[in-house]
Amino acid sequence: MVGVKPTYGVVSRYGVVAFGSSLDQVGPFARSVEDAALAMNALVRGGSDHMDCTSQSIATDFTANLEEGVKGMRIGIVPTFMEAEGLDAEVKERIEEAGRKLEAAGAELVEGELPNAQAAMSAYYVLGPCEAFSNLARFDSVRYGYCVEGCKDLNEQYELSRAGGFGVEARRRIMLGSYLLSSGVYDKYYYPAQQVRTLITQDYMYAYHKVDCILAPVSPRTAFKFGEINDPTSMYLSDMFTISINIAGNGGMSVPVGLGVASGLPIGAQLIAPAFRDENMLRVAAELERCYGKAPIAPAFAKAGE
């Protein structure tokens, strides 16, 4: 499975129920890089959407350079990601192997640094819940959202409808956002998180002076089965390599680079593009797909589907 998260503003968010307005982005899942690129062409349609003020006018054919290979491209390897605590040795080896394959195909591997990337998770779990609290407040069961019938009064309707309409994680983030935006707390957490966001965005801008695309893990471990992990902290840590690009607004995508030996489940390489140069990551992804072949269905899922 190939997944694409475009640069913020490339695809219109019109029609999307907002969770975090500065973080939400629409992108495709596909069985191949070419399919993902074709889906991107359909989503973008060559222009901005007047229904979304963040939408940019992009006139790019995302399939145009899929066959060009990576010769002459500079691929960034970031020690902050590759030496991160908690990164599974098997995942690390697969990403390093992917780098070697790209180098053999003519790319140049360049070591880069994102000095503030380690602070991305802390900043995200301030900014995300704050935006979620603001956006989801409209779902009051009267004007918008799920409504429990037969309540004795309006307060009970609000309480039961919001409790029943939102899942556990959504409620957790709404409550956290409410606290973080409260008087006396806002200046202590929200404002510094925005400053960290600016620093991370600048880090990526500086990094792309030297590279055309960054190669990194998607997750610190192989894919896990649905329901296997219930601890919220462990779930949050599974996003440790993808959060910084959401904060910065850069495009990123996942492309399979093999299956875990023990689990038989996929390992993904993350490709991170400069802002509004999403075609770069698709070009590199197409080369990796040629190296590894199109992703097979994981045996565990193939068996379940028989």
Describe the predicted segments one by one.
Residues 1-3, 232-233:
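A glycine- and small-aliphatic-rich helix-loop capping segment at beta-alpha/alpha-beta transitions
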Residues 2-93, 97-98, 151-160, 290-306:
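A short helix-breaking turn/cap at a secondary-structure junction
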Residues 42, 126-127:
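Conserved catalytic core of Hanks-type protein kinase domains
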Residues 58, 117-119:
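Short acidic loop-to-helix transition motifs that present clustered carboxylates
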Residues 86-90, 123, 228-230:
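Short, solvent-exposed loop/turn segments at secondary-structure boundaries
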Residues 88, 103-104:
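N-terminal G-site helix/loop of the GST-like fold
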Residues 101, 108-109, 119-121, 128-134, ...:
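Glycine-rich, small-residue loops and helix-cap segments
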Residues 111-115:
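A short beta-strand-loop structural module common to alpha/beta enzyme folds
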